């Protein structure tokens, strides 16, 4: 129904924003990934959108990129996955990480996201593999650089989890750090993540 919205960013919370378009304020639920891409409050913002319609609810979801919205819609096709869980996945992992987990049949990469257990992770991979492959066939052949980055991220996450930190908190911190500084070593990522977690 709505492809996208462009307007003034009037309110910003960790999981939702309000965008004013022609005098009408629209509330969007967003992922942590989209939150990181937002401009300053009061600036113009562009969000791709998805409208969830239920008997007692009309809820808009906003995305900084088309790929994220596309994956959100695919996740909703999975048995047992609703908007809340789909958004949690997109907050805890990058679009590419979820694609890689699906295409390489590694459900353990999805563990740790609130609400995602072994059965749910297995269903996501089983039900979405062909759909993700059609969307991005090149992703099936992960480049050495991307594989290296994925292994580095997993090593950093696993190391921090062994120190007693929550996997979902660690994943969010590590993903954010690698997005900003993709050239870091595992040790540097761990140190930066520890600082980020303690400061949050």
UniProtKB/Swiss-Prot annotation:
Residues 65-143 are annotated as: Domain II. GO terms for molecular function: ATP binding; four-way junction DNA binding; four-way junction helicase activity. It comes from the Bacteria. Residues 154-200 are annotated as: Domain III. Disulfide bonds: none annotated. Residues 1-64 are annotated as: Domain I. InterPro entries: DNA_helicase_Holl-junc_RuvA_I (IPR013849), Hlx-hairpin-Hlx_DNA-bd_motif (IPR003583), NA-bd_OB-fold (IPR012340), RuvA (IPR000085), RuvA_2-like (IPR010994), RuvA_C (IPR011114), RuvA_C_sf (IPR036267). Pfam families: HHH_5, RuvA_C, RuvA_N. The keyword Transcription does not apply. Keywords: Cytoplasm, DNA damage, DNA recombination, DNA repair, DNA-binding. One of its GO terms (biological process) is DNA repair. One of its GO terms (cellular component) is Holliday junction helicase complex. Residues 144-154 are annotated as: Flexible linker. It is found in: Cytoplasm. HAMAP family: DNA_HJ_migration_RuvA (MF_00031). NCBIfam families: ruvA. Belongs to the RuvA family. Homotetramer. Forms an RuvA(8)-RuvB(12)-Holliday junction (HJ) complex. HJ DNA is sandwiched between 2 RuvA tetramers; dsDNA enters through RuvA and exits via RuvB. An RuvB hexamer assembles on each DNA strand where it exits the tetramer. Each RuvB hexamer is contacted by two RuvA subunits (via domain III) on 2 adjacent RuvB subunits; this complex drives branch migration. In the full resolvosome a probable DNA-RuvA(4)-RuvB(12)-RuvC(2) complex forms which resolves the HJ. Has three domains with a flexible linker between the domains II and III and assumes an 'L' shape. Domain III is highly mobile and contacts RuvB. The RuvA-RuvB-RuvC complex processes Holliday junction (HJ) DNA during genetic recombination and DNA repair, while the RuvA-RuvB complex plays an important role in the rescue of blocked DNA replication forks via replication fork reversal (RFR). RuvA specifically binds to HJ cruciform DNA, conferring on it an open structure. The RuvB hexamer acts as an ATP-dependent pump, pulling dsDNA into and through the RuvAB complex. HJ branch migration allows RuvC to scan DNA until it finds its consensus sequence, where it cleaves and resolves the cruciform DNA. This is Holliday junction branch migration complex subunit RuvA. It comes from Pelodictyon phaeoclathratiforme (strain DSM 5477 / BU-1).
